[in-house]
Amino acid sequence: METQIHQLEQEAYTAVLRAFKAQSDAISWEKESLITELRKELRVSDDEHRELLSRVNKDDTIQRIRDWRQGGASQITRHATIQPFDVLPSPTFSAARKKQKTFPSYNPSIGATGNRSFNNRLVSSGISGNESAEALIGRKVWTKWPEDNHFYEAIITQYNADEGRHALVYDIHAANETWEWVDLKEIPPEDIRWDGEESGVALNIGHGSASFRGNRRGQIHGGRGRGPRIHQPRRELVPPPTQQNGSGGRRTSSDDIELFNTDSLVKEVERVFDSTHPDPLELDKAKKMLKEHEQALIAAIARLADTSDGEMDGDPPYSHDHPMPQG
């Protein structure tokens, strides 16, 4: 009976794909969000999706409609912002939006970006030229995530001129900080709001953190190009036991050992490796984090060994008057 139920679920999902394909070879953000939810509710896996989509593409009726459309028949454009339909077979990852390395510093240049007329031009016609794009650094922006229809606040911190993408940082400077590279021209005007913009639209502001949204994105597989991102665990400063040195001084902050939170690191790496279709970029980041953590542990052990040798040479033993910091 369970097999029959799942067959009905696949038939329903296929019917929706055929209907969307019949309408257009392109898909709007709204349709993509709907398909994402259907995949979850109808229990359609990534492999099943690819197989069903392949069947739809080979369907004789769909092919006739496609030929008719390409033959010059009038086509009603239902949505202004669309993307190729065939990106859906692997919705888990997208080159458009992936979390990158932590930015070492954040120095917003608000004064250079407070031009509201430029802001309006950006939303309606995109960015023209590197100078205008870089002027957005430091701006506050809200973007809508299709899966919950909420807007989330981010700060634009960098611009990659080669790829034409801006870095959006959510929960900046917080322990759960997350970020993504975005081509702002790909975001529909109704899905983005700018600080100071008098749009007359009441924002449905989300109260969840960006890290929660990143994890949720990884679970439902899809949405507006945001793939599951590897969330770099927070580093913790672990001071060695305090000791008196030869001149009676205490240790300095340079004596602290900086390590990733091991539990968080292991969980994050497991999440990346356990995904159905791991992203090579995310795998590479996970390997680099593990290697960095390994090197930090080796360095910490070496420093502890040096300190222990100092005790054997006659230095006073450690005093334990400084508690370990709570993560």
Swiss-Prot record:
Residues 32-58, 281-306 form a coiled coil. The modification Phosphoserine is found at residue 308. Isoform 1 interacts with EDM2 in nucleus. InterPro entries: Agenet_dom_plant (IPR014002), EMSY-LIKE_plant (IPR033485), ENT_dom (IPR005491), ENT_dom-like_sf (IPR036142). Residues 318-327 have a biased composition (Basic and acidic residues). It comes from the Eukaryota. It is found in: Nucleus. Residues 1-88 form the ENT domain. One of its GO terms (cellular component) is nucleus. Residues 206-257, 305-327 are annotated as: Disordered. This is Protein EMSY-LIKE 1. Keywords: Coiled coil, Nucleus, Phosphoprotein, Plant defense.
